[in-house]
Amino acid sequence: MMWLLLTTTCLICGTLNAGGFLDLENEVNPEVWMNTSEIIIYNGYPSEEYEVTTEDGYILLVNRIPYGRTHARSTGPRPVVYMQHALFADNAYWLENYANGSLGFLLADAGYDVWMGNSRGNTWSRRHKTLSETDEKFWAFSFDEMAKYDLPGVIDFIVNKTGQEKLYFIGHSLGTTIGFVAFSTMPELAQRIKMNFALGPTISFKYPTGIFTRFFLLPNSIIKAVFGTKGFFLEDKKTKIASTKICNNKILWLICSEFMSLWAGSNKKNMNQSRMDVYMSHAPTGSSVHNILHIKQLYHSDEFRAYDWGNDADNMKHYNQSHPPIYDLTAMKVPTAIWAGGHDVLVTPQDVARILPQIKSLHYFKLLPDWNHFDFVWGLDAPQRMYSEIIALMKAYS
């Protein structure tokens, strides 16, 4: 489990200053200590940063790359892309490889206006108009609220800022979940999406085998007793420093690599070892216990439903019915492209196969047999095997 890795990390880090361990450390990548705006500027791209306030009061940080390094002199509006990250991540992970291998930068260089959101509750979106992050009520959200409030709020902001009525949506993992919920329940929002690109879509969650699923065997009462009812896996500076040391060591980086395999599936040859410290330093960024319980609900119920509040009375209060509503994927009309990984132990090929017949607007599907759950954003061969296809589909559905 995550806490076992972190404990081991801290114990090992206590020895790093002894003997020759320091001689085995690679030079730390400067992006380890940078936020998203700083990473963008460091790579030579224009950076803009905005705060978006949702209808229910959450203040979300959104980053923008308005144009690429090769399009600085061109004028006129560019097609807009919005990117939504996975659980425990932030929007920096669209940019954590070198510029020629990061989807956010490649899209900007291909002529797109790139926007990247941060989900409520992560390090960069942990503010509210009236609530404090110490309030339990602040953390009473799951991907339901991210779909109902965050995504519409951010898209409205982008439309107003750019003057463009339609945009492309790219989601990874839980980012796809947010998109599918929003586009299947809000037709007016769906009409603003030119195409939905789903990378490792987390909808069916019946067959995961990764280490994180062991956590879902615990009763809700135990999870709440251990982790409380507020934030979950929030960013910790001491852990960040420790994990950076481990992942940057020429021998001990294998611990990071092995943990990633347990979490996401094995495909070590496709990960850039020299960037391991960057990957680990930007995660976890946190979410809510409430959100984790909703994902656990998907695992146990095998149904794509809204959050179950645990009793008929509370469900009636939230949904005007005794059971949480099922999200009907067949109602989504947005043209959709899906990529799945054959070695993905979190979103398995079996689970992806189960949802394909429900997506009536599926225009493209590809299974990458050797990919794990992280290859969609960090894979060395992602630019050739997937990113080029995304750009080609965008041009086809312009």
UniProtKB/Swiss-Prot annotation:
The GO molecular function terms of this record are:
lipoprotein lipase activity; sterol ester esterase activity
Q: Which residues are glycosylated?
A: N272
> Which Pfam families has this protein been placed in?
Abhydrolase_1 (PF00561)
Which cellular components does GO assign to this protein?
extracellular region; intracellular membrane-bounded organelle
A biological process from GO: lipid catabolic process
EC number(s): the record gives 3.1.1.13, 3.1.1.3
Localization, per the record, is: Secreted
What SUPFAM superfamilies does this protein map onto? alpha/beta-Hydrolases (SSF53474)
Q: Which UniProt keywords apply?
A: Disulfide bond, Glycoprotein, Hydrolase, Ichthyosis, Lipid degradation, Lipid metabolism, Secreted, Signal
Is Disulfide bond tagged as a keyword? yes
Cystine pairings recorded for this chain: C247-C256
Q: Which reaction does it catalyse?
A: a sterol ester + H2O = a sterol + a fatty acid + H(+); a triacylglycerol + H2O = a 1,2-diacylglycerol + a fatty acid + H(+); a triacylglycerol + H2O = a diacylglycerol + a fatty acid + H(+); a cholesterol ester + H2O = cholesterol + a fatty acid + H(+)
Catalytic positions are: S173 (nucleophile), D344 (charge relay system), H373 (charge relay system)
Q: Which residues form the AB hydrolase-1 domain?
A: 79-379
Top enzyme class, one word, equals hydrolase
Q: In which tissues is it expressed?
A: Highly expressed in the epidermis in the granular keratinocytes. Also detected in other tissues, although at much lower levels, including lung and spleen.
Q: What does this protein do?
A: Plays a highly specific role in the last step of keratinocyte differentiation. Contains two distinct domains: the alpha/beta hydrolase fold and the abhydrolase-associated lipase region, also features the consensus sequence of the active site of a genuine lipase. May have an essential function in lipid metabolism of the most differentiated epidermal layers.
Q: Which disease is it linked to?
A: Ichthyosis, congenital, autosomal recessive 8: A form of autosomal recessive congenital ichthyosis, a disorder of keratinization with abnormal differentiation and desquamation of the epidermis, resulting in abnormal skin scaling over the whole body. The main skin phenotypes are lamellar ichthyosis (LI) and non-bullous congenital ichthyosiform erythroderma (NCIE), although phenotypic overlap within the same patient or among patients from the same family can occur.
| Protein's recorded name | Lipase member N
Native species of this protein?
Answer: Homo sapiens (Human)
Q: Name the gene for this chain.
A: LIPN
